[in-house]
Amino acid sequence: DSYLNSMKKSIQANDGAYDLIDGYAAVIGGAYADGLMMNLHDVSNLRPTSMWWSQLAVNELTVNGKLFGIPGDLSLNLWKNIHVMFFNKTVLENNGLEKPYDTVKNGKWTYDKYLEMNVGVARDLDGNGEVSLEDSFGSIYYDDLSFDNFHNAFDYSYTVKNDDGSISLDLDEQIMVDTYEKIRSLAYENPDVYYNKGGKVEGTIDVFTQNRALFFASVLGDAEKMRDMNSDFGIIPFPKLSEAQEQYKTTSRDNRSMFCIPTDVKDADFAGLITEALCVASNRGVVPVYYDTVLKGKVARDSESAEMLDIIRSGLNFDFAAEFAIQTGRAGFILRDAIYYDKNYTTYYNESKKMFNKAFDRFVSYYMEEK
């Protein structure tokens, strides 16, 4: 709050102190609603449709022709926070399973296939008859944010765009109920899956690096924590809902950057030029080094994982409701919250829909104002 408030005060005072704002994605939307950021589509020398900006994000986050913040190659945290699945090759071999790379490439890496590979992997290693972090598992999750990514992986959006350029919530659909039931069962009922509810990555990742979990659902940046892992591991995308789905999809967590130009900027054209140039330079000189040298060269243990990274990157997606969940009554966090609090999806939605719609429509109304 102090970060956002300090920035707001400066812009409202017309200080002209900032040419470019590297906004914290989770909260920067509060400045959009206050009319403090420029429409990036109107900034000369800035080209949001260029490949170094995330095009799926530009398409999803543009409403009524307005885009107030943009993620792109200007910051590596976009890619470090992208959701992926890691698999442990030692655990894979010990359970007589095949590497899932060909399954991914053939478009057959589905949720059902993922569940199938988990079956029978869990072991009560300490023999106490209770499930704990001392045991082994098919999959391990340390927070509800990874569960939240399944709605992206299943290629479903929380919103729908309307003919008048506006956007509306679309949470009351059977696919959301079905997704909730699948993920709730995964979190609370699957004997081969451990949900370290409220846990931290530091304690949970040890289960994976110590060969006690086949799959670890997390973010790509956590691969850097596995450099000293003795066993080899692979990186694959989250599974699709079915083979009929054309593309593997994922998203990047909201503790990343969103780049904005404030309305009190002294020279918007210059700010756009520098922002574009920085993003181009990072796209050509920083991101390739991170992927080819750090990830593909030092972290990824095989060429197949390097190929998987390209597939994952191509499916980076964003959801307007999830992107601005804090500003819209947590409507875009409905899946993670229902899972975390173990509440029936339909009941939770019916209890919250009036609040969701009111907060969401209020936020969207700024996009619909004529400027």
Show where each model-derived region lies.
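Conserved C-terminal helix/tail region of periplasmic/extracytoplasmic solute-binding proteins
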Residues: 263-272, 279-371
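Acidic, glycine-anchored loop motifs typical of Ca2+
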Residues: 60, 124-135
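Short helix-initiation/N-cap motifs at beta->coil->alpha
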Residues: 1-6, 107-113, 194-209
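Extracytoplasmic/periplasmic substrate-recognition and gating elements
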Residues: 226-295
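Early extracytoplasmic/lumenal segment of secretory-pathway proteins
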Residues: 1-25
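Short, solvent-exposed loop/beta-turn-alpha elements that line the ligand-binding surface or hinge
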Residues: 41-53, 104-106, 132, 157-176, ...
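Glycine-centered hinge/linker elements that transmit conformational signals in sensory
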Residues: 115-119, 149-198
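Hinge/lid segment of periplasmic solute-binding proteins
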Residues: 25-82
